[in-house]
């Protein structure tokens, strides 16, 4: 299910290093949110607990993985790699239970530098266990198009690999540079492996966010920073200054490496106010993760124009619920205006067109507080807001989006 400590997204490791360097004493709490209609079972919760206690707790960095990280990820400092070599997941940091509504209540609590690696690992485990203990038909008697009812898991994986190859060829034919970003909501480890086997045949694949598969398939591990870096910073320095402090601190830690700035933590307008000339020049580009992507392209170009920066020397990385069709349209819209690339996730590792009878889980695990101070994510899409109601109300007021009584 989780085969290696590297079976995780690169940005969790890069953020872990930054937290260790700048905020080693910070305490964090994360919470799971199920945005969909799927429900869980007692059997599911018991199996998840077993996986945490018996499997994930035993993961550790091997000597070979240690050497590979040092060679392929030179931005990870030797002191951090030594820390990671000795890192162990602590099951006691994870609390899980089944609610009366058969939903999953999951909380992760502990030092920020320790708990930061749980998010992707737990989401991948939740997704795979759901499709193992609750919706089981897909891997033995699936009714997916082109797959017979008597299909075995092997034949499903083979058919799925062909589907992914078709998607990859569409992206390649249209010149779309893209990375695989699908670890957190993958249907299973085996299916994720099949996805990568297919995608490495595509010339415009630039890499994968999953460090284990980057190593296995000889592609580039891709990733920079996630929302939690900025969210956590807001609790430590104040929300009004969080974007600026977060991105200046990131530069201090990585000296210009990993230079894609995430824009929507407190809404993109708040971000652009904080992205001054120095930061706009230092960062290679911006990542779009919510809101209308076409409006975002225009806003980014406007921002660079005001700064006297040629947008054709910068890049937008799109990562919001993308599929091949959306990527192709965005590529055409950006042509001649600004460079672009795509981080494509669930539509590769848990494609809803292929698995029509059992759609992927719509779930997140988000940072809830740092040192007991609630944090929020505002986003450019209202349905993606996370945080306590009062904290959201105050945050929207601070960034100028709403009045306190709205």
Curated annotation (Swiss-Prot):
GO cellular component term, pick one: cytosol
Tagged with keyword Phosphoprotein: yes
Modification after translation (UniProt): Transiently phosphorylated on a His residue during the reaction cycle. Phosphorylation strongly increases the affinity for substrates and increases the rate of nicotinate D-ribonucleotide production. Dephosphorylation regenerates the low-affinity form of the enzyme, leading to product release.
Transmembrane annotation, as ranges: none
Alphabetized InterPro entries for the sequence: N/Namide_PRibTrfase, NAPRTase_N, Nic_PRibTrfase, Nic_PRibTrfase-Fam, Nicotinate_pribotase-like_C
Protein EC: 6.3.4.21
Catalytic activity: nicotinate + 5-phospho-alpha-D-ribose 1-diphosphate + ATP + H2O = nicotinate beta-D-ribonucleotide + ADP + phosphate + diphosphate
Domain of life: Archaea
Signal peptide (residue range): none
Top-tier EC class: ligase
Gene3D superfamilies in alphabetical order: nicotinate phosphoribosyltransferase
Keywords: Ligase, Phosphoprotein, Pyridine nucleotide biosynthesis
Pathway: Cofactor biosynthesis; NAD(+) biosynthesis; nicotinate D-ribonucleotide from nicotinate: step 1/1
Modified residues (Phosphohistidine): 227
GO biological process: NAD biosynthetic process via the salvage pathway
A GO molecular function held by the record: nicotinate phosphoribosyltransferase activity
Task performed by this protein: Catalyzes the synthesis of beta-nicotinate D-ribonucleotide from nicotinate and 5-phospho-D-ribose 1-phosphate at the expense of ATP.
Entry's family note: Belongs to the NAPRTase family.
HAMAP family: NAPRTase
Protein name, as recorded: Nicotinate phosphoribosyltransferase
Organism: Methanosarcina mazei (strain ATCC BAA-159 / DSM 3647 / Goe1 / Go1 / JCM 11833 / OCM 88)
Source lineage: Archaea, Methanobacteriati, Methanobacteriota, Stenosarchaea group, Methanomicrobia
